[in-house]
C-alpha cells in the first residue's frame, strides 16, 4: 500500500507499507494505549529505503513522556545491575557487545595513526556492558565517557566505577567535544530527527582525528522476525539498511568508511557503519586490511 510520508532521513515523500502492527507493545500498554482499533504501520521510504514507524496519535503523545525514562518500563520488576552482571558473564561468542567491541577495536587498530590515548564517548551508555568490555579489551588505556539520560541507568553506571559518566540527554553540549571516537549503539533508531542529531555528534569529533561508529536495527527485521519482536516496537522511529544509513551519514557531512549487515549472537539483525570527517580521512587514509 502506497502512503504519503515525510522522510526525516532524505526528505522523500512517497512510501510503501511493509508491515502493519495490530496491537500495542509493552511500552504502550504501560501508559494506557488501548488495543481496540490499534494500527501502526511500518512504511518504507521509496527514495532512501529507510523504514519509518508511523505511530497512532495517542501513542505518539503518550510515548513522548516515556522516552527519557526508558528503563522504568524496560526493567520493571528487575535490576539493571543484575542484567549487567549476567550479560558481562556471557562467553564472547554469545555476546552482542563482545562482537561490537571487537569490531570497534579492530577498526581503530587498522586505521592508521590512532592516538596513544584516544578519547571515547558512548552516547546512550545504557547498562554499560559495551563500555565495560571496551575498558577491559583496551586494558583501561583509553579515556572513556558514557552519556546516559535515564536516572536509574546513570546511577548504575556510576556504581560500576569503570568510566566517567554524564547523566544528561546528549544535545551537542560544548563540553562534550574533542573526542577521537564516538559510539552510537542502538541509539539512532530512537531519534525522530536523526540528521540534526548527527550534525551535533559530528561537532563532538576531533575534525582531523575523529571516528564515528553507528549500529542500528536492520530493516530486514520487518520481514525475517515476528511482528511482536521488540525491534518493531513503538519506541523505534526508524529501521535502516546499508543504503539509508550511508545516505544519512553522508548528509551529516561524514565520509563513509564501512557499512555492513550482521546477524548478532542474540538473533538481532543489525546494520553498522564507521564514518569520519573528511579531514580525518585526508590525514589518515583508509583502514588497512
How would you describe each model-predicted region?
Residues 1-185, 195-200, 261, 269-274, ...:
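Conserved N-terminal segment of class I S-adenosyl-L-methionine
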Residues 9-16, 243-259:
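A SAM-dependent methyltransferase catalytic signature shared across enzymes that methylate proteins
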Residues 23-29, 214-239, 243-248:
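Short, glycine-/aromatic-enriched active-site segment of Class I SAM-dependent methyltransferases
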Residues 250-255, 267-268, 278:
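Substrate-binding/catalytic lobe of Class I Rossmann-like enzymes that use SAM or dcSAM, i.e.
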Amino acid at each position: 500500500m502506497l502512503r504519503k510520508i515525510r522522510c526525516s532521513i532524505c526528505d522523500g515523500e512517497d512510501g510503501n507499507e511493509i508491515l502493519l502492527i495490530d496491537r500495542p507493545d509493552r511500552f504502550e500498554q504501560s501508559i494506557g494505549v488501548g488495543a481496540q482499533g490499534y494500527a501502526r504501520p511500518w512504511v518504507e521510504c521509496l527514495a532512501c529505503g529507510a523504514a519509518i514507524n508511523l505511530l497512532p496519535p495517542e501513542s505518539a503523545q503518550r510515548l513522548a513522556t516515556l522516552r527519557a525514562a526508558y528503563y522504568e518500563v524496560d526493567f520493571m520488576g528487575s535490576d539493571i545491575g543484575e542484567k549487567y552482571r549476567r550479560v558481562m558473564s556471557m562467553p564472547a561468542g554469545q555476546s552482542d557487545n563482545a562482537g561490537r567491541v571487537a569490531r570497534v577495536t579492530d577498526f581503530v587498530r587498522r586505521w592508521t595513526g590512532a592516538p596513544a590515548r584516544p578519547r571515547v564517548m558512548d552516547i546512550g551508555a545504557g547498562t554499560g556492558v559495551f563500555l565495560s568490555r571496551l575498558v577491559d579489551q583496551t586494558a583501561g588505556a583509553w579515556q572513556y565517557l558514557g552519556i546516559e539520560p535515564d536516572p536509574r541507568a546513570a546511577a548504575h553506571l556510576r556504581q560500576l566505577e569503570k568510566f566517567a559518566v554524564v547523566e544528561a540527554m546528549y544535545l551537542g553540549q560544548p563540553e562534550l567535544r574533542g573526542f577521537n571516537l564516538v559510539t552510537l549503539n542502538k541509539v539512532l533508531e530512537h531519534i525522530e530527527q536523526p540528521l540534526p542529531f548527527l550534525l551535533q555528534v559530528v561537532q563532538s569529533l576531533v575534525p582531523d582525528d575523529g571516528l564515528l561508529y553507528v549500529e542500528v536495527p536492520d530493516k530486514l527485521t520487518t520481514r525475517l522476525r515476528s511482528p511482536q519482536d521488540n525491534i518493531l516496537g513503538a519506541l523505534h522511529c526508524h529501521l535502516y539498511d546499508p543504503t539509508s544509513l550511508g545516505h544519512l551519514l553522508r548528509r551529516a557531512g561524514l565520509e563513509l568508511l564501512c557499512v555492513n549487515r550482521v546477524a548478532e549472537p542474540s538473533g538481532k539483525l543489525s546494520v553498522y557503519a564507521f564514518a569520519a570527517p573528511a579531514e580525518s580521512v585526508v590525514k589518515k587514509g583508509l583502514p588497512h586490511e
